[in-house]
C-alpha cells in the first residue's frame, strides 16, 4: 500500500464530472489496484475513488504533475499534485479477513453441509476459498455447473455486498472459474444492501439460523 499526503486538486472524468478544489488530502494506492482520495472527516468513506482494475500513469505538468488513474471503462481520476508532504509504501501481505463471530461461523458450517439450501443442484467446491484479497466463505457450483461465490453474514449490510463485489471482480478474471455469480446470504438483509446487490446481479438469500440449527438436513428450507 502506498500512502501519499499531498496538496492536490482532483477531477473525475467519466459518465459524470466532479471537481475537488485544492486541499491537503490522503491518497491511498492499494495493491489490488484501487485508488481512493480521503479528507480528515467522513469516517472511512473517500471523497472519490476508482475501483480495480485500473492503471496509474503520470503526465508531466511542470511544477504540478498530474497522476491519471484510468479504469477499464475509460473513466479517469486526474490528481494534480501541487506539493507532496508524505509518500511511503508498505507491504501488508495477505489479510486473513475479519474473524467471524460464533453465529456467522456456524452459519458457514451449516450452509456448507447443506448447500442445497442455495438452490436445487448446488454442490460445494470449498469453504474459505482463498483469493489475493481474502477468503470467499463458500465457492459452489450451481445446477448447470457454473461457479458461485457465497458471502455469509449475520446482518447483511452494504459493506458485505461491497466485499462480495470485490471477490467477484477478482474471481471473474480467472479464466478457469469465470463466469462467477454471487450469492449474499444472511439472517437479515437491510433494504439498501438488497437493492445494491440486486443492481449488481447478486442474488440475496435470507437464512433462519434457529431453524437451520434445529431441523434435520432433509427439512432445511429458506425463509
UniProtKB/Swiss-Prot annotation:
Its main location: cytoplasm. GO terms for cellular component: cytoplasm. It is an enzyme of class 3 (hydrolase). The keyword DNA-binding applies. Pfam families: NucS_C (PF01939), NucS_N (PF21003). GO terms for molecular function: DNA binding; single-stranded DNA endodeoxyribonuclease activity. Its EC number is 3.1.-.-. It is found in: Cytoplasm. InterPro entries: Endonuclease_NucS, NucS_C, NucS_N, NucS_N_sf, tRNA_endonuc-like_dom_sf. Keywords: Cytoplasm, DNA-binding, Endonuclease, Hydrolase, Nuclease. CDD domains: NucS-like (cd22341). Belongs to the NucS endonuclease family. PANTHER family: ENDONUCLEASE NUCS. Cleaves both 3' and 5' ssDNA extremities of branched DNA structures. This is Endonuclease NucS. It comes from Mycobacterium marinum (strain ATCC BAA-535 / M).
Amino acid at each position: 500500500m502506498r500512502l501519499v499526503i499531498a496538496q492536490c486538486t482532483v477531477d473525475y472524468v467519466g459518465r459524470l464530472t466532479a471537481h475537488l478544489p485544492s486541499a491537503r488530502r490522503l491518497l491511498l494506492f492499494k495493491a489490488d489496484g484501487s485508488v481512493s482520495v480521503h479528507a480528515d472527516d467522513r469516517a472511512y468513506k473517500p471523497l472519490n475513488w476508482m475501483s480495480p482494475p485500473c492503471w496509474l500513469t503520470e503526465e508531466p505538468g511542470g511544477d504540478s504533475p498530474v497522476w491519471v488513474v484510468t479504469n477499464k471503462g475509460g473513466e479517469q481520476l486526474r490528481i494534480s499534485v501541487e506539493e507532496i508532504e508524505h509518500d511511503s509504501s508498505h507491504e501488508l501481505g495477505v489479510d486473513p479477513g475479519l474473524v467471524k463471530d460464533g453465529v456467522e461461523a456456524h452459519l458457514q458450517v451449516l450452509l456448507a453441509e447443506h448447500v442445497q439450501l442455495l438452490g436445487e443442484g448446488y454442490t460445494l467446491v470449498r469453504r474459505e476459498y482463498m483469493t489475493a484479497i481474502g477468503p470467499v466463505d463458500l465457492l459452489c457450483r450451481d445446477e448447470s455447473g457454473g461457479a458461485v461465490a457465497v458471502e455469509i453474514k449475520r446482518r447483511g449490510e452494504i459493506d458485505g455486498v461491497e466485499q462480495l463485489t470485490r471477490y467477484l471482480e477478482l474471481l471473474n478474471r480467472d479464466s478457469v472459474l469465470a463466469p462467477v455469480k454471487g450469492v449474499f446470504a444472511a439472517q437479515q438483509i437491510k433494504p439498501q444492501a438488497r437493492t445494491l446487490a440486486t443492481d449488481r446481479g447478486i442474488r440475496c438469500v435470507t437464512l433462519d439460523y434457529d431453524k437451520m440449527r434445529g431441523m434435520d438436513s432433509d427439512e432445511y428450507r429458506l425463509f
